[in-house]
């Protein structure tokens, strides 16, 4: 009864969160079993467990992470918290200098090389060494303004969690083999990176601190979407949802058009294609998501 009441409470909140295409079936067949699995598989210990949710843009990683945290915190009474790779971007200044030094596309946030992985590692370290009274600031990034919120506005987590959830579109990914490097594969690469300088730089960055962070995962859960077209469409739905939730007029003006969203997703296409092919083998749990936004569990440990 506890789990189902938590699930129905979560279901009532979906309207308030403006999350589309969420069903009670998703909560009963996906959220609840995974929450119970985590509780039963990972007994209490001194160090938090580090769980990664990976999958393309708009696949539902953050939503799934949020609801599992809610069930663990409120029903199973296992403290859980989460953060996103989208909250640990490098600053505009850092990306600007990369753009001057390496390639103009390095300024655009999102691909490996544009995140401050050390910030993420420091956060994990702080939470792992926290006492019950420790207050840890969780980084928060404002996408429409392309900057971190001032640190005094960052959310605070009190105590030491049993679980740290991390959602990242490229979580767990290995670098692409460079010997079979494909020529430019979309309009963005053809026009702005015909020599592959930027895409190879990002791939090399993925082989550095990212692998250090990914090696800490106690469990990797992947949401596998059907294809790249789905990623484009999902990311556009996400932007429309953002447009409904943003009240500030200046921020509303920074919401992307459909063309801008598609151009933006082109930055991720090379690595996303590789992830869709290779990452299911490396993941502990794989959720398949079809074109109608329905989830099913396709791989379990």
Which sequence ranges carry the predicted segments?
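Conserved lysine of the Walker
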Residues: 61
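Conserved nucleotide-sensing/catalytic segment adjacent to the nucleotide-binding pocket
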Residues: 81, 88-141
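Phosphate-binding/switch loop-helix module in NTP-utilizing enzymes
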Residues: 125-173
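Conserved NTP phosphate-binding and transfer environment spanning the P-loop NTPase/kinase superfamily
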Residues: 170-301
